[in-house]
């Protein structure tokens, strides 16, 4: 039986991932910030906000999946920016210190990251061979998060970094936010509309994570995005058609930056990111184009 330790296991990605892992011969320990009782014999919860939590984590952990981190979908005040950074760095460091103190390290660590690692560009296509240093706040979060995760290599653990694109799901996240203006007939172009949206269907993301965990030749960073990214204007048009709504309005970049503040970078300063590395290992996307993904997710 394979032993999993998961942070962020009750979030949008984590909860679906847990449901998928449960189908195999496994036991899952989920680290949470509050007391929780499990009614499932395959799942146990450990409140790692409490002193002594380390002693409640099983000794024979095979796989660590680190998804913990505060949501980006809030206004980035100076205080919240600190929360965004520390929620990722401190949790990753705590995991490292846990296994450093033990004689047995996990075989593999899957650590979440984001395509915000790459600089915004309207014309460049980014693959995993591209290396960079932090250039803004979001890229600094990603860079530091990956750096802390890579410490696990010192323990002999295989480290896999998953740079998530925009996750499309019915359970929350970007898609639910993007649907709102179309619901009220005010959806349309954002800024120039030429910025890239490198997206991924939640089901493909879950399968990609498990594929990388189970593939012993997988290590280092992987772009977890669909093979065909779209520019925002076409993305919005495709979403509007799926919802049977118009795509006619325009929100200027300046207005969005004034309203959203630094958080506007998530929708305006984006990248074209391609999943070359995972495809080279043989992974096949079920939802490779946006129309197919939205038809599955939106039943209007």
Swiss-Prot record:
Cystine pairings recorded for this chain: none
Source organism superkingdom: Bacteria
Signal peptide start-end: none
Classification via Pfam families: DUF1731, Epimerase
Protein family (similarity comment): Belongs to the NAD(P)-dependent epimerase/dehydratase family. SDR39U1 subfamily.
Record protein name field: Epimerase family protein SAS0734
Lineage, highest ranks first: Bacteria, Bacillati, Bacillota, Bacilli, Bacillales
């Amino acid at each position: 039986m394979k032993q999993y330790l998961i942070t962020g296991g009750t979030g949008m990605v984590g909860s679906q991932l847990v449901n998928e892992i449960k189908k195999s011969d496994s036991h899952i320990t989920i680290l949470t910030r509050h007391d929780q009782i499990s009614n499932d014999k395959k799942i146990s919860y450990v409140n790692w906000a409490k002193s002594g939590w380390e002693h409640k984590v099983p000794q024979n952990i095979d796989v660590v999946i680190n998804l913990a981190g505060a949501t980006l979908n809030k206004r980035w005040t100076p205080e919240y920016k600190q929360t965004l950074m520390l929620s990722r760095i401190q949790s990753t460091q705590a995991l490292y210190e846990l296994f450093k103190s033990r004689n047995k390290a996990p075989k593999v660590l899957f650590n979440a990251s984001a395509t915000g690692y790459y600089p915004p560009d309207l014309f460049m296509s980014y693959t995993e061979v591209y290396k960079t240093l932090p250039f803004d706040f979001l890229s600094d979060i990603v860079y530091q998060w990956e750096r802390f995760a890579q410490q696990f290599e010192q323990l002999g653990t295989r480290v896999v970094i998953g740079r998530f694109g925009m996750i499309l799901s019915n359970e929350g996240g970007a898609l639910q936010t993007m649907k709102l203006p179309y619901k009220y007939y005010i959806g349309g172009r954002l800024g120039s509309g030429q910025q890239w949206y490198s997206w991924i269907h939640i089901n493909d993301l879950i399968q990609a994570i498990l594929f990388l965990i189970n593939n012993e030749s997988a290590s280092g960073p992987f772009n977890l995005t669909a093979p065909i990214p779209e520019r925002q204007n076409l993305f919005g048009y495709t979403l509007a058609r799926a919802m049977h709504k118009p795509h006619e309005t325009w929100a200027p970049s300046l207005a969005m930056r004034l309203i959203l503040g630094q958080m506007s970078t998530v929708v305006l300063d984006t990248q074209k990111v391609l999943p070359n590395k995972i495809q080279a290992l043989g992974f096949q996307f079920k939802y490779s184009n946006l129309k197919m993904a939205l038809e599955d997710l939106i039943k209007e």
